[in-house]
Amino acid sequence: MDTIKFDKERTLVIAHRGLSGIETENTNAAFVAAGNRSYYGIETDIHRTADGQFVVIHDYDLKRVAGLDIKVEEVDFSVLQEIVLFDKEGSKNREDLRISTLDNYISICKKYNKHCVLELKSHFTKEEILGIINIIKGHKYLDSVTFISFDYENLIKIKEYLPEQSAQFLFREFTEGLVEKVIADKLDVDVHHKVLNKGVIDMLHNNGLVVNCWTVDTKERGEELAQWGVDYITSNILE
């Protein structure tokens, strides 16, 4: 299996949860697979564990990825480390497919010179946000990180520590006053692709906003968005 190539114009492509169309999402294998391809960046999701570790996983529990009714934030990292995740065929035959850490993710992105698109999934405290920042600072890689979140307060906390840091608010549809709010808070946008057209993208650009969109997996839609000038496309399989 290979990625789907498309004419991306000047749009930058982000591998969603790593190259999750080919490898199990949010694993080191998915991050390395994306690292070995032409992606500009690699997106992942961060949760905290019961003992305060930062791990990369999308869901709040392990039902979908491992068939286990375990909530990520209610167990220590040592418990999560022992669990093998499903591969793309639904089996557990690969010992390497395990829950990774923020530290591992940053290391892989840095090795392959990929931009980090880091979704803050939990509702983090200021102290936890600072902990995440310090892990990235330890790799000297903050300049290559964009924070994203559906939780607006997470992004405000990022901006309190790092006023000039790249950060994008995730949302599914426009609401009254949203554009004005993100401009005031010096954020950019990461929006569901279905609400975008050329007029909307132009409006956002005219307001000085960087436009990321998710999750685009067909060649036709990817090329349409690229022709309209969207800045980033987040995809499971397009390259």
Which residues does each predicted region cover?
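Phosphate-group recognition and catalysis centered on beta-loop-alpha active-site segments
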Residues: 1-239
